[in-house]
């Protein structure tokens, strides 16, 4: 003797549609995205300035040493400096991506970073130069930052956008 079966649907019910956002919510969202973009641009400028200051300071510190002390300070500056640059660049690119909601947002950080780095390599009227050609640490930081921006940008562009 069998009992009658209860009918069960095998197709999942679609979730109820959410109401479209109000005008105030859209305005707030747009304002937050613009603010995130502005913060990302200023973060790129600040990151480049800090990299130039660190590379110049570490290079001068390295030039004041000789022998084993020079090697120890140089290795320490590279071991600390390059991973910090890579981590800060990844964090800045991710912040730009999340705060603006656009996959292209890493450009907001990368363009001012490149402009400041290039400006650091140009001699001023007074003769000041933030990034000299023999500063190997500065060149390593530039390469690390540029490659990281390229990888982060490529990663954000290749990843499919989230389903909303």
Predicted regions, residues:
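Membrane-helix interface "capping/anchor" motifs
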Residues: 94-108
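Central hydrophobic cores of alpha-helical transmembrane segments
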Residues: 105-117
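Cytosolic juxtamembrane helix and N-cap/initiation of the first transmembrane helix
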Residues: 2-43
